[in-house]
Amino acid sequence: MSRKGPSKKHVVLPDPIYGSTVVAQLINKILLDGKKSIAEDIVYSALDMVKEKSDQEPVAVLKRALDNIRPSLEVRSRRVGGATYQVPVEVKPNRANTLSLRWLTDFSRARREKTMAERLANEILDASNGLGASVKRREDTHKMAEANKAFAHYRW
């Protein structure tokens, strides 16, 4: 462990168009090979598509989608006496945000639409309505935690 104290958290500055740190974090998750301008184009065009399709504020739809994806429980492996148990633990808020953004981008990339902006927009819309692969991932995570509730006393 570090003797210098806890590591400093990286502060993400809000994006220039919507003034939202959530959008800035999404841009950073979409980012590949350091091409930030391309990532910004993808996210902003996806949010424009969300606005066209839903007639609602795109940042509000994105936040609702992330709330639907955000896990509250997960399982972590704990080795006890030669056996490895899947122990359910609560997810810290920072990790929950990171997981929801990661799942949103990963399952957007796995979709079948033609452009990444379309995939991201449709995944955001699906997640805001409680559908889509990213919401299913959260449900599966919660089911795993529920199934292993018997090992909750091993948590640390």
Swiss-Prot record:
SUPFAM superfamilies: Ribosomal protein S7 (SSF47973). Keywords: Ribonucleoprotein, Ribosomal protein, RNA-binding, rRNA-binding, tRNA-binding. GO terms for biological process: translation. One of its GO terms (cellular component) is small ribosomal subunit. GO terms for molecular function: rRNA binding; structural constituent of ribosome; tRNA binding. Part of the 30S ribosomal subunit. Contacts proteins S9 and S11. Belongs to the universal ribosomal protein uS7 family. One of the primary rRNA binding proteins, it binds directly to 16S rRNA where it nucleates assembly of the head domain of the 30S subunit. Is located at the subunit interface close to the decoding center, probably blocks exit of the E-site tRNA. This is Small ribosomal subunit protein uS7. It comes from Bifidobacterium longum (strain NCC 2705). The gene is rpsG.
